[in-house]
Amino acid sequence: MKIYEGKLTAEGLKVGIIVSRFNEFITSKLLAGSIDCLKRHGAKEDNIEVCWVPGAFEIPVIAKKMASKGKYDAVICLGAVIRGATPHFDYVSSEVSKGVAHVSLDKEVPVIFGVLTTNTIEQAIERAGTKAGNKGYDAAMSAIEMSNLMKILD
């Protein structure tokens, strides 16, 4: 039996990160977590490129643009969609997750879903580096592992 696993080293990887400006007090912490993870695992700052978009709904189109370039080993998508009193949360979170998954499958580039979808602001804050770790850091770990796994399977 042959088992394949991606290494957890970011040396030589080029990573694009897309960050939603909406709820920036949360998303900036997710971005910091992603960058911290990439650098701790050997990525050079020059190999990390960040695109800010207005909101989470705009993430998939920029993910597609970045994944299409053939320049990135992975694209990390970061945002924070927090439930409110209207169904807007359901529409946005559903379409963003579908869009990100579609890009990854279509372009065969790891496009990592690091968009928080929470019921409360408190839950988002917890997942951005307080109680529940930093989901931006976790997204970067997934990007590293998946990038290296894709290289093995090529």
From Swiss-Prot:
UniProt: 5-amino-6-(D-ribitylamino)uracil binding residues: 22, 56-58, 80-82, 113
Gene Ontology cellular component annotations, sorted alphabetically: cytosol; riboflavin synthase complex
Source organism, top-level taxon: Bacteria
UniProt function note: Catalyzes the formation of 6,7-dimethyl-8-ribityllumazine by condensation of 5-amino-6-(D-ribitylamino)uracil with 3,4-dihydroxy-2-butanone 4-phosphate. This is the penultimate step in the biosynthesis of riboflavin.
Catalytic center residues: 88 (proton donor)
Molecular function via GO: 6,7-dimethyl-8-ribityllumazine synthase activity
Record's catalysed reaction(s): (2S)-2-hydroxy-3-oxobutyl phosphate + 5-amino-6-(D-ribitylamino)uracil = 6,7-dimethyl-8-(1-D-ribityl)lumazine + phosphate + 2 H2O + H(+)
Binding residues annotated for (2S)-2-hydroxy-3-oxobutyl phosphate, in chain numbering: 85-86, 127
A Gene Ontology BP annotation from the UniProt entry: riboflavin biosynthetic process
Protein name per UniProt: 6,7-dimethyl-8-ribityllumazine synthase
Organism this protein belongs to: Clostridium botulinum (strain 657 / Type Ba4)
Alphabetized NCBIfam families for the sequence: lumazine-synth, PRK00061.1-4
Pathway: Cofactor biosynthesis; riboflavin biosynthesis; riboflavin from 2-hydroxy-3-oxobutyl phosphate and 5-amino-6-(D-ribitylamino)uracil: step 1/2
Assigned EC number: 2.5.1.78
Signal peptide: none
Keywords, alphabetical: Riboflavin biosynthesis, Transferase
SUPFAM superfamilies: Lumazine synthase (SSF52121)
Pfam family, one: DMRL_synthase
Family: Belongs to the DMRL synthase family.
